[in-house]
Amino acid sequence: MRKYFSLLALVLIVSVVFAQRSIDSMVQAEKNFASTSLVASTKEAFVKFIDTAGIVFEKGNPVNGFELYTKSDRRPGILTWEPEYAEISSSNDFGFTTGPWKYYANTLKDDPLAKGHFITVWHLNNNGEWKFLIDFGINYNMEQKKMALKKAKPEKKTLKKDFQQSLKEAEEKFIQSYKTQGKKAYSSFLSSNSRLNYAGYLPALNPGARKALIDSLPAGMGYIIIGFKSSPQNELGYAYGTVDLNDKHEGYLRIWRRENDGWKIAVEVLHFK
């Protein structure tokens, strides 16, 4: 009898782990994150859902978000958001979510004081919990169009046999190409299925919108890589750091997707305009 209950307990544990290892559970984690912000506070939401090594951006610099929010006081206002797109690796333990956010001074009945789009990268930690590794957003003044949630499931890739490039190498190569070629560098590195989140603009989701945003970029931006991480199967990953232009200093985030012809930029988040 004891053996039977031990086996039953093991089955239940395995079932829970596999239930959490899915795009639906990652999306639910994002929704729970947003719900906690609304019901409790933004501070409590970030402390609860961020990985202890998770990154947020403060005054253009990437910092440890767990330490920042643990030590900070509650901030006034109400921050709301919801995912409209989610993508996950084939191992179902690493992915990202994105969608609109709004900030209200007192109540949700008021007009929002600010709005924009967020990007959050998630992973399953050793306890089988979804925690976010990095969170970054942009703001804009345009009206947000409600979009139905879209989930991108993993696609089987037929990589070239000699493909050995790491995500770090891809990021470094793009930055070097940008130094020498400027905006033309995007033609070799940007995925045909990509999102550009630039401050002051709605996310660019189609070729025409992406070209318009890239053309709007100022020349001479200097990137410094501070960190990067890829999924266990090296299918998704991200690189982040700072970007400088004259006296302006901001953070940046790129999410990379490994496609049939190598690493391609799936999402780029910039605050320069």
Residue ranges and their predicted role:
Residues T70-K109, R210-E250:
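Surface-exposed, charged secondary-structure patches
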Residues N61-V63, Y85, G200-A209:
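Intrinsic, low-complexity N-terminal interaction/targeting segments
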Residues V39-G60, T180-A199:
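Short, well-ordered alpha-helical segments enriched in acidic and aromatic residues
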Residues K115-K151, G251-K273:
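Short beta-strand edge/turn micro-motifs at domain boundaries
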Residues F33, G95-T98, I119-W122, W130, ...:
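Short, structured motif recognition centered on aromatic/hydrophobic residues
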Residues R21, S25, K183, F189, ...:
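C-terminal functional regions that serve as terminal interaction/effector modules
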Residues M1-S25:
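Bacterial Sec-dependent N-terminal signal peptides
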Residues F18-K43, V47-K48, K131-L133, I138-T180, ...:
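Short, low-complexity N-terminal intrinsically disordered segments enriched in polar/charged residues
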